[in-house]
């Protein structure tokens, strides 16, 4: 039977899930199940710094397969930039290594405009 490791954050993000996932994902299938590009994580390998927002941190490891799941909201321009940046750094990002769920959500420009408008309307009642 295969080993399964699940990393769950309970602090509204920014608690180090990406770093922990990277440490346990040397040869595995890494899944990003939820979230968007607003948060990010940075991993260091051999003195090289990788900053990621949408892709699982394990994408920088050569023997992993990565999945972006149905609960992820994807800004396509950010994803494309992230992939191009990693490829320029020598990371192989290909359809064989990166699977994107057809049920993942796509962030469109009007979503960003609506989000900005809603935040402005909240005024001092923000969280």
Predicted regions and their residues:
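Non-transmembrane, aqueous-exposed alpha-helical and coiled segments at domain scale
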Residues: 1-127
């Amino acid at each position: 039977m295969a080993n399964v490791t699940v990393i769950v954050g309970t602090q509204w993000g920014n608690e180090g899930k990406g770093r922990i996932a990277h440490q346990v994902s040397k040869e595995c299938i890494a899944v990003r199940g939820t979230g968007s590009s607003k948060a990010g994580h940075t991993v260091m390998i051999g003195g090289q710094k990788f900053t990621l927002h949408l892709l699982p941190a394990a994408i920088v490891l050569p023997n992993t397969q990565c999945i972006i799941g149905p609960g992820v909201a994807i800004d396509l321009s950010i994803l494309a930039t992230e992939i191009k940046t990693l490829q320029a750094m020598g990371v192989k990002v290909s359809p064989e290594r990166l699977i994107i769920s057809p049920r993942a959500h796509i962030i469109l420009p009007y979503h960003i405009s609506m989000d900005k408008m809603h935040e402005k309307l909240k005024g001092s009642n923000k969280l």
